[in-house]
Amino acid sequence: MHGVLKVRTSEEKAKAQRLKELEKIESYNKLVKSFEELREKQNGRYDEISLSVSKLVLIENPEFYTIWNYRRLAILQFTETKENSELQVIYQNEMKFLEECIQRFTKSYWIWFHRQWIALRMDNCDWEREMKLCTKLLNFDLRNFHCWGHRRFILKHSNIKLEDELKYTTEKVEQNFSNYSAWHQRSSILPKIYKEPEQLLEKILEEFELVRNAVYTEPKDSSSWIYHKWLVATIKSIPNSNYIEVLKNELTQIYDLIELEPDCKWPIYTTLLLKIEIGGFEKQELLDIISQLIKLDPDHKNYYKSLETKI
């Protein structure tokens, strides 16, 4: 009928979508073909066109690692033919391009690897900007381990204070106790900040308080329990820490949690580890805990059985 808007059927929509996808695939294949023809023609000699053509492919498919290698070879060749000022411009442009890629593909290993490679070649990488980029991305996805890895890379190669990063991880774990990456980041920087045994011991005791809040809030989440396990191993390694008394106190605290969550495996598992570490408990008592864990978590039966060798 005239004047009546035609509504597409589901079949028509699917067909239109398929045609759109085919056009995109065809366009991508043409880009790849252009790149391969250029690479063959150049025969190991690179220029700005090398970067331009390879860029078009990577914008669509950042997992094409061969092309990232190609770009690095091109840039390495430029270091032999160009002035440093020209190279710095190339590096800056590369960082801008990579940021565009990251906005679309936040978890591509090859993008992050290439970004770090470029950053180390720059005379003055803007590390603060790098950190802000990671912070921005983590606000959208707190579990993006590429961002957390990049933050560690930044801390290693810059003068950014570890204390600031510790504060950041505190904010993140308090926002979400399930943030495994934030807990892991914490474990990697604490020993670097508190280098003296006395200082580290004092901080570790504070950390037991922090993680206690976490396990009481989210007792079934593994993140904070794994961090608790790291705290136990760390305090044990500190000379004159009187760690056995600390572990006994932890054991008492976790008993209280088990009363509230009798069917939660993590506090039960942690009591087993603590009792093995403290020593002096009856073997049958520990075997009973292992049997209880196997009932609660049969998928990890073999692991729990392996703990019998430590009793």
Swiss-Prot record:
InterPro entries: Prenyl_trans_a (IPR002088)
Any one GO molecular function term: Rab geranylgeranyltransferase activity
PFTA repeat ranges, renumbered to this chain: 49-82, 93-126, 129-162, 164-197, 206-239
Keywords (A to Z) from UniProt: Coiled coil, Prenyltransferase, Repeat, Transferase
Domain of life where this protein originates: Eukaryota
GO CC list: cytoplasm; Rab-protein geranylgeranyltransferase complex
Coiled-coil regions listed: 12-43
A Pfam family per the record: PPTA
Catalytic activity: geranylgeranyl diphosphate + L-cysteinyl-[protein] = S-geranylgeranyl-L-cysteinyl-[protein] + diphosphate
GO biological process: endoplasmic reticulum to Golgi vesicle-mediated transport; protein geranylgeranylation
Gene3D superfamilies the record matches: Protein prenylyltransferase
EC code: 2.5.1.60
Role, per record: Catalyzes the transfer of a geranylgeranyl moiety from geranylgeranyl diphosphate to proteins with a C-terminal sequence motif -XCC or -XCXC, where both cysteines may become modified.
Subunit-structure text: Heterodimer of an alpha and a beta subunit.
Entry's family note: Belongs to the protein prenyltransferase subunit alpha family.
Name recorded for this polypeptide: Geranylgeranyl transferase type-2 subunit alpha
